Curated annotation (Swiss-Prot):
GO molecular function per UniProt: chlorophyll binding; electron transporter, transferring electrons within the cyclic electron transport pathway of photosynthesis activity
Organism of derivation: Manihot esculenta (Cassava)
One GO biological process term: photosynthetic electron transport in photosystem II
UniProtKB keywords: Chlorophyll, Chloroplast, Chromophore, Membrane, Photosynthesis, Photosystem II, Plastid, Thylakoid, Transmembrane, Transmembrane helix
Gene: psbB
Protein name: Photosystem II CP47 reaction center protein
Any coiled-coil regions, as ranges: none
Topology of this chain in the membrane: Multi-pass membrane protein
GO CC field: chloroplast thylakoid membrane; photosystem II
Role played: One of the components of the core complex of photosystem II (PSII). It binds chlorophyll and helps catalyze the primary light-induced photochemical processes of PSII. PSII is a light-driven water:plastoquinone oxidoreductase, using light energy to abstract electrons from H(2)O, generating O(2) and a proton gradient subsequently used for ATP formation.
Keyword Signal: no
Family label: Belongs to the PsbB/PsbC family. PsbB subfamily.
């Protein structure tokens, strides 16, 4: 049978045994990829600096997902939080990877078995002896089982009743760790940044799934509904399954890109909106102001800013800065962060404090402009010297560092001042090692960006797939030219047109 590539799946259309087989094989491929990818990432991952070289800077994709579910230790003796451990146990990164690979192998064997032994009694209708699936009943079984899994995850794993809990952090991604989470049953449970909502929603959705599954197992659909929604057609199952998948893909693309309790910034990196809104910058200034109010010096106040918080306030960690086709991790772009140089404060010769305007997300280049506390432009790096009025040289700008490696160091020569003014456009200033990975200096996106792009793209593709297969199953008779209520046996193929009234008939 010479089928075109886009019609090859018709071979399992009326073959339940082999339909099951190819789905088991697909599960084997997915689990095998996950386990293999985890082992690859563990082979290249450097856990030595969780502050300046976290997993998301290194381009890790599956390690963050394991970590948010409670895996923090490695058989290599390290912990994701930076410490060392002696007994990681079976549920370590390598243990989870190995479990996926073993599961993949078992699924592979099961797929082969079901391909060979495809003609099982369970797939046959007792009355006709032909292959037949009770799709509403199967739907009820699957709904019930997924409800049990959903409820179990929320009630046991997330809450720590039987499991580790999940990754929970503060709003600024500084104190994250795996811990049990109590369900949030109030209105706060609907806040996407409240971890308790994860527990309560899984418990509620799981309960609903269990009840709905039992309903569909005990109540048969009305005949009119059964026929209207083509519940006896396997392509209906395909269409509705695709709908569930694309809807989920759109949802997770949103929670990843805009941020939520399910996508902590310590594991996936900050969101672009945290740069756009000056989220970390405001918190840093708040802490410095609080320090000054306690009679600390400017140097002392800035020295107490956590390096981790300062690093978030750097445009190179913005996932929207990476180009669409720039492959590689963030470390391959601007380099591996080595240390915070400190916060530069610029002043003109009259002693006014000046602030460098920060580069917006979607700019590759941006003019260097320094404004005072009232937003009035006081200095810049001009494009044409002949026209300049506010150049660093003319205004006499100096820079002094507070906190970090250059704490207390000041510069007055214009070349150095301009260098740090350009770097201040990009947020807090860090020393970056470009030599180790031969980094090219061009920003890359984080796994947050990759995940969002991939899931949004496939969601759109699957949306069209849902429309396509839904239309095919609902209007099958129209497309085939066959009346669904046809009670005469028709010899199709005897004439060029299906449904030709001159076609030979034989009354049943």
């Amino acid at each position: 049978m010479g089928l075109p590539w886009y019609r090859v799946h018709t071979v399992v259309l009326n073959d339940p045994g082999r339909l099951l087989s190819v789905h088991i094989m697909h599960t084997a491929l997915v689990a095998g990829w996950a386990g293999s990818m985890a082992l690859y990432e563990l082979a290249v991952f450097d856990p030595s600096d969780p502050v300046l070289d976290p997993m998301w800077r290194q381009g890790m994709f599956v390690i963050p997902f394991m970590t948010r579910l409670g895996i923090t230790n490695s058989w290599g003796g390290w912990s994701i939080t930076g410490g060392t451990i002696t007994n990681p146990g079976i549920w370590s990164y390598e243990g989870v990877a190995g479990a996926h690979i073993v599961f993949s192998g078992l699924c592979f064997l099961a797929a082969i078995w079901h391909w060979v032994y495809w003609d099982l009694e369970i797939f046959c209708d007792e009355r006709t002896g032909k292959p037949s699936l009770d799709l509403p009943k199967i739907f009820g079984i699957h709904l019930f089982l997924s409800g049990v899994a959903c409820f179990g995850f929320g009630a046991f794993h997330v809450t720590g009743l039987y499991g580790p809990g999940i990754w929970v952090s503060d709003p600024y991604g500084l104190t994250g760790k795996v811990q049990p989470v109590s369900p949030a049953w109030g209105v706060e449970g609907f806040d996407p940044f409240v971890p308790g909502g994860i527990a309560s929603h899984h418990i509620a959705a799981g309960t609903l799934g269990i009840l709905a599954g039992l309903f569909h197992l005990s109540v048969r659909p009305p005949q009119r509904l059964y026929k209207g929604l083509r519940m006896g057609n396997i392509e209906t199952v395909l269409s509705s399954s695709i709908a569930a998948v694309f809807f989920a893909a759109f949802v997770v693309a949103g929670t990843m890109w805009y941020g939520s309790a399910t996508t902590p910034i310590e594991l996936f990196g900050p969101t672009r909106y945290q740069w756009d809104q000056g989220y970390f910058q405001q918190e840093i200034y708040r802490r410095v102001s609080a320090g000054l109010a306690e009679n600390q010096s400017l140097s002392e106040a800035w020295s107490k800013i956590p390096e981790k918080l300062a690093f978030y306030d750097y445009i190179g960690n913005n996932p929207a800065k990476g180009g669409l086709f720039r492959a590689g991790s963030m470390d391959n772009g601007d380099g591996i962060a080595v240390g915070w140089l400190g916060h530069p404060i610029f002043r003109d010769k009259e002693g006014r404090e000046l602030f460098v305007r920060r580069m917006p997300t979607f700019f590759e280049t941006f003019p260097v402009v320094l404004v005072d506390g009232d937003g009035i432009v006081r200095a810049d790096v001009p494009f044409r010297r002949a026209e300049s009025k506010y150049s660093v040289e003319q205004v006499g700008v100096t820079v002094e560092f507070y906190g970090g490696e250059l704490n207390g160091v000041s510069y007055s020569d214009p070349v150095t001042v301009k260098k740090y003014a350009r770097r201040a456009q990009l947020g807090e200033i860090f020393e970056l090692d470009r030599a180790t990975l031969k980094s090219d200096g061009v920003f890359r996106s984080s796994p947050r960006g990759w995940f969002t792009f991939g899931h949004a793209s496939f969601a759109l593709l699957f949306f069209f797939g849902h429309i396509w297969h839904g239309a095919r199953t609902l209007f099958r008779d129209v497309f085939a030219g066959i009346d669904p209520d046809l009670d005469a046996q028709v010899e199709f193929g005897a004439f060029q047109k299906l449904g030709d009234p001159t076609t030979r008939r034989q009354v049943v």
